[in-house]
């Protein structure tokens, strides 16, 4: 295959508005500097206790939990473009206000609001891709967005740590500006893709909840999220508990970012040739295996190797859930279906640290094999509903 043909297989055939969304997503993630450092900001810059910091972080998770169904409803009701742009503008304003808030009640309320608005763009973004991209190209398109998110976030982690030395307020302003750029790009360059009113059917969130196949998919993803998110919640605690320095966790997670940035674009188009449910199940299983072998790791290199295993599983899952949701959702309910899917991640974000840290304290020898079993359970569940997903996809293609 020629170089041109190779590049065409990876990025060709996608409409211009998709690339605007891709670029805006990348810019937005370049500025994602507040969330990763919010715990350090609260304890060091604002002098907040660890207990209060935990409360503030919980409010952020609660806000995210509330935002997904609401944003999904707005996406279908008002439109994709206005929901995404409105969410970005609201996030920018909240970031700036939060950066100058000093009282604990203000921080609690501010983080709740931030949790509501910061990810409100997700259902709209997913619906735009579903509206614009053909079913056969959706796994590739969602995979490219996944790559943009991870590449931007990797840069933001490094840049945010450096900029924080100049004062944490800078992080809030950078985050706000990149949110505004994303919102402006969408408003100016992406047309509204929601089905015309005369073509759209009436629909309610209750209609989504009656879709047993979608509910089964969401429950399986929730189980998977409980496993995957341990890499960001319980794993650093387990490593420091083994006497490893904080830098060891940073090195292990650098392996995660490097593998995603390098491997995922190379495999994205190739994986799209296979059945989505089987690839997703393989990814769930490999993530489970990666966390299970964490129980064998006692050094920085050992943990980095375990992270490499579950990162390869993460690469397998890139883009596929969004494509499955798009295939399951009727056009007039795409926002709400995407919101329900996002709800599984928001719930996982709340539950993962609670479950993981308690297991680590009560049964440190069982925590990683148990999460490995959860990953395999999610894989089996995905295989069980795979035939029904294929049948529904064929009907909606």
Kindly label every feature range from the protein language model.
Residues 16-61, 215-252:
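Helix-loop boundary and gating motifs at the non-cytosolic
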